[in-house]
């Protein structure tokens, strides 16, 4: 679906080389064949579908596409709760200035029933997880990364980029 989305903007040759570079120049190959139980590939897959459906909905809005957007958003949020921010991709798609922001708000208002359907679809996808958390922890929302935290006052940018342990640029040089 990433290919289909990229073909809206670029030639087939450019898209093919780009996808090859992403596949070989990032951790995608490793996570595809060696760590298939990790969430990364599923996250990439659902995000790619979300991008494609976002483009097609903006080209020709239909209720079916809106429901698919909700399903993709729900699945992305299940994979990683922070992925709920992917909704911003849909909401801000092609917004570049105040004029396009106003046009987008008008479009979203015109298709508010599509937005409602997307939210309901996402909720239906996510509700079993909420029930599970309620049953197991007694809370509707549960933060499962209890030992993880952010270090905003002491960022380790150089280590994050170049460390041999988890260096972003070391293991994904194409970036």
Describe the role of every protein-language-model region:
Residues 7-10, 53-59, 92-102:
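Structural signal for the C-terminal ends of transmembrane alpha-helices
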Residues 89, 93, 112-175:
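Membrane-lumen/periplasm interface segments of specific transmembrane helices
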Residues 63-65, 103-120:
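Membrane-interfacial entry segments at the cytosolic side of transmembrane helices
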Residues 19, 65-80, 87-91, 123-124:
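Membrane-interface alpha helices of multi-pass inner-membrane proteins
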Residues 42-73, 89-90:
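Specific aromatic-rich, kink-prone transmembrane helix
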Residues 30, 64-72, 153-161:
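Alpha-helical membrane-protein architecture signal
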Residues 19-49, 53, 74, 78-83:
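Aromatic- and kink-enriched transmembrane "portal" helix at the membrane-lumen/periplasm boundary
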Residues 2-26, 45, 60-68:
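Transmembrane-helix signature of polytopic, membrane-embedded enzymes
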């Amino acid at each position: 679906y990433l290919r289909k989305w990229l073909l809206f903007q670029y030639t087939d040759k450019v898209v093919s080389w780009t996808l090859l570079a992403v596949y070989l120049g990032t951790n995608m190959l490793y996570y595809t064949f060696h760590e298939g139980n990790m969430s990364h590939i599923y996250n990439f897959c659902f995000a790619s579908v979300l991008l494609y459906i976002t483009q097609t909905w903006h080209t020709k809005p239909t209720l079916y596409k809106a429901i698919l957007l909700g399903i993709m958003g729900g699945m992305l949020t299940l994979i990683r709760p922070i992925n709920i921010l992917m909704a911003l991709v849909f909401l801000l798609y092609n917004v570049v200035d105040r004029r396009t922001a106003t046009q987008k708000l008008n479009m979203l208002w015109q298709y508010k029933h599509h937005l409602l359907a997307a939210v309901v679809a996402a909720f239906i996808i996510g509700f079993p997880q909420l029930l599970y958390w309620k049953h197991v922890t007694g809370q509707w929302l549960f933060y499962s990364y209890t030992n993880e935290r952010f270090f905003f006052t002491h960022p380790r940018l150089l280590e994050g980029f170049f460390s041999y342990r988890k260096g972003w640029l070391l293991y994904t040089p194409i970036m």
